[in-house]
Amino acid sequence: MVVKKSRGSSQQLPGLGGQGGCTGFVGMLGTALLFISLPWGAQVMASANISTALGHTSGHYLSIGDGSVTEFDFPEKSEGIIVISSQYTGQTNGTGPSPILKVISLDTEVLTIKNVSAITWSSGGGFVVGIHSGLAGLAPLHLQLMDFYEAPPLLIEERRDFCIRVSPAEDLPSALNTNLGHFSENPILYLLLPLIFVNKCSFGCKVELEVLKELLQSPQPMLLGLLGQFLVMPFYAFLMAKVFMLPKALALGLIITCSSPGGGGSYLFSLLLGGDVTLAISMTFISTVAATGFLPLSSAIYSYLLSIHETLHVPISKILGTLLFIAIPIAAGVVIKSKLPKFSELLLQVIKPFSFILLLGGLFLAYHMGVFILVGVRLPIVLVGFTVPLVGLLVGYSLAICLKLPVAQRRTVSIEVGVQNSLLALAMLQLSLRRLQADYASQAPFIVALSGTSEMLALVIGQFIYSILFPVP
């Protein structure tokens, strides 16, 4: 049984009152002890409807409830208890020394264990485990029933099948403070989705097939971009997650961000910084299509290496679905330009006035997102997010220098690796994870997007000033 502390009227605890197999004065005393252990003398039970009757235990000494349930819901940022029954001989009849129960939470960001106390009642014994929940997520439990009176200590039983699912509150503090609904519920978002789809289709109409053919014949820039985007940058995210010991949700957000394809206006920055614009558009198209394979793969690999998969479900299928939502209209645009060039030109003309609407809507949603996502942001992820675009720019330029590419292509490769589609990463996280987990993980792409835009604008301004001070004759 899992019980939460709260103020208010008390509720009957199944299994420790008159209905759960505990009778008489000793049973009432057991119930009283549980109430004393919780301030205010009031409890709210978790959503699982279970009993602490010592019945079905599937051949185990330890059980929670009747043994038929192994996953229990618990609210976020709360304190409470877990009642674990024990049928170990000696503890149930009080004739032998009491064993000791060790309880370990395998994700302390989601759930921490405060204390473990042994209890007895007329029909058996068990343990009361004090818990404190943090972020929403799944916290597996590791139970070890030990007999320390033996030499060496005897491991009586070990269980790893129980877990506590910490669920987010219905109303987040940030939403209550700002009187705003969550940005994912904003109708503007749903109004912009068709425009985003058409905009991506029009982007595909800008891809020059001749440039794509040239890239296939001389694939050095394309290969360097793919190498930087899907090998070097995800590995950098992995290193930063290790060095700064980022929480698992943040680590996942950073991995997905650094595994994202080029985008975020990279071809515009190529134009402003003297890069090869047609190459930039083609590289963005190729990396977006390639991301449908590479991004889920790198997310799965690094999630395993960082043990994220143990406590946080990484929804690879949803990530892939979000990528396809972007890749399919871009590919459709390429086909339209090839087969229907006049319609392609018309589409480009039609989307131009709506681009301004997309820009305004994007700025509004970005502000609205920041209200939720940046609540409680900490320094480590800010520092890491600030370095990601800079490292990408340096990696891309260094790789291009190694192959002695022309200056314009060097700048394009550098920008394609450094300016990743962080907003795509943010969308994948928001559509794939539960709300609180998604908002927490989204701190990484949001900060990377802010940092990347600021740093690229600084480069544009710097080059503009340089061109004025040192004009080319």
Swiss-Prot record:
GO biological process, one term: response to retinoic acid
UniProt membrane topology term: Multi-pass membrane protein
A GO-annotated cellular component: membrane
Highest taxon of the lineage: Eukaryota
Listed Pfam families: NTCP5_P3_N, SBF
InterPro entries associated with the record: BilAc:Na_symport/Acr3, Bilac:Na_transpt, Na+/solute_symporter_sf
Transmembrane helix keyword on record: yes
Family, per entry: Belongs to the bile acid:sodium symporter (BASS) (TC 2.A.28) family.
Name recorded for this polypeptide: P3 protein
Gene (UniProt): Slc10a3
